[in-house]
Design a protein with these regions (language model features):
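Conserved glycine-rich Rossmann-like NAD(P)H-binding loop of the short-chain dehydrogenase/reductase
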Residues: 27-42
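Substrate-binding pocket helix/loop in short-chain dehydrogenase/reductase
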Residues: 90-91, 95-100
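Active-site helix of classical SDR
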Residues: 114, 150
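Conserved glycine-rich cofactor-binding loop
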Residues: 13-14
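The beta1-alpha1 cofactor-binding region of Rossmann-like NAD(H)/NADP(H)-dependent oxidoreductases
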Residues: 54-64, 96
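C-terminal helical subdomain
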Residues: 170, 174-175, 195-240
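Residue(s) in the substrate-gating loop at a strand-loop-helix junction
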Residues: 134
């Protein structure tokens, strides 16, 4: 068994989640990787790693997977809530089912993970929860109304729960990336919105890479437990909004 703490990462099958898994594995941590695409998790081929097919909107699935990992690696030391969806559209034309999906994954998916691990962390008086939000949780963007709303919620409840957990030496960090070169945009169904977004990305030169965000997550975690980095906002230098 590793002498380093267990790291749980949701949405770990690609993008930021996959890069974060690789970063923590390189640092010597045992991992529990959660996602709906089990084959993509297993393709990472990381040592001391348990891969589980989990839907973050199902709290029981998260709890079952974490219980299994803790039996092998010990208690969760850090939870990285990374799973999320971005479905862009205008409020009067977007399918409300897409709103519901974003609310369930981006808000409830994060809260479900917190609910499963927080009590144990408070009891042990040690632990870190890192929630991957977005710069869209701090300001609004065209076609992003509900997505911005879900990410604003992540910022709000992360800060409030951080206050509740601070006296137990449990840390909460919000990571708010700008435009990242990932699969996230592929969820959007409007070709025009996707095309416009891609044109906007071109104005930035090079968007963030998943590894850039993963390095920020690892940096926040690796600070001494007495230091809580509450929020990291990182964007391409040429991203003007």
């Amino acid at each position: 068994m590793s002498n380093k703490g267990l790291i749980v990462i949701t949405g770990a099958s690609s993008g930021i989640g996959g890069a974060t898994a690789q970063a923590f594995s390189k640092a010597g941590h045992p991992l529990l990787l959660l996602a709906r695409r089990l084959d993509r998790l297993e393709a990472l081929k990381l040592p001391n790693t348990i891969c589980e097919k989990v839907d973050v909107t199902n709290r029981d699935e998260i709890k079952s997977a974490i219980t299994k990992a803790e039996q092998k690696f010990g208690p969760v030391d850090c939870l990285v809530n990374n799973a999320g969806v971005m479905l862009l559209g205008l409020a009067d034309t977007q399918d409300p089912k897409e709103w519901e999906q974003m609310v369930q994954v981006n808000i409830m998916g994060v809260l479900n993970g917190i609910h499963v691990v927080l009590a144990g962390m408070k009891e042990r008086r040690h632990g870190t929860i890192i929630n991957v939000s977005s710069v869209a949780g701090r300001k609004t963007y065209s076609n992003h109304a509900v997505y911005c709303g879900t990410k604003s919620a992540v910022h709000a409840f992360t800060e409030q729960i951080r206050e509740e957990a601070a006296s137990y030496d449990v840390r909460f960090t919000t990571i708010a990336p700008g435009v990242v070169d990932t699969e996230l945009l592929s969820h959007t169904t409007s070709k025009q919105i996707v095309d416009d977004y891609q044109e906007w990305k071109k104005t930035m030169g090079q968007p963030l890479q998943s590894e850039d965000v993963a390095n920020s997550i690892l940096f926040a975690y690796q600070q001494p437990q007495r230091i809580c980095i509450r929020e990291i906002v990182l964007c391409p230098t040429r991203q003007d909004k």
